[in-house]
Amino acid sequence: VGVMIQRPPTIRGLSLRHMIEICGATPQETEQMARWMGLADFLDRSVNEGFSGGELKRSELLQLMAQKPDLLLLDEPESGVDVENIALVGRAANYILHNEPCGGTGCDKPCCAHNLDCDTYNPLSSQRSGLIITHVGHILKYVPASHAHILYQGTLSCTSGDPLDVLSCISKTGYEKCVNGGCRRGMK
């Protein structure tokens, strides 16, 4: 199980590089993944020390990429992240879940939003699962999700086969309509 929390701790004295290798990456994989995540210059710094919001998210995702969890839990991945980093967070989460290179035209980057129509991309090919807790849903532009559930006052109040339908319903009519069954009835 791999977990990305809203505010990860700083770990002074442990370099990000060492942490990634503890998670299971080889030195070469560590360098390559750090470049993908824009963190190559951070590898020899203490884990999360002095990192911005976006850097924290990227650091956590880098650790999760090395860990290769069977179950990925993301708690508000958009929290404290600018638009540019949301795209990177989403692509990294998608890579963790599917762990597939693009396979098209010599691309060796993680399969991500810019190459989702790649011939070899199949979001259902992975045996990995994920749970994403989100309030704004921006992450759904990058991570294909199969179901949406709304937890409201401790009760699972709305369930749908299409997360984008639920998000659209909430955006247009608010949580109240969804909680009262509007999203389940196909209201958008």
Protein language model annotation of sequence segments:
Residues 86-126:
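Helical segment within the ABC ATPase nucleotide-binding domain
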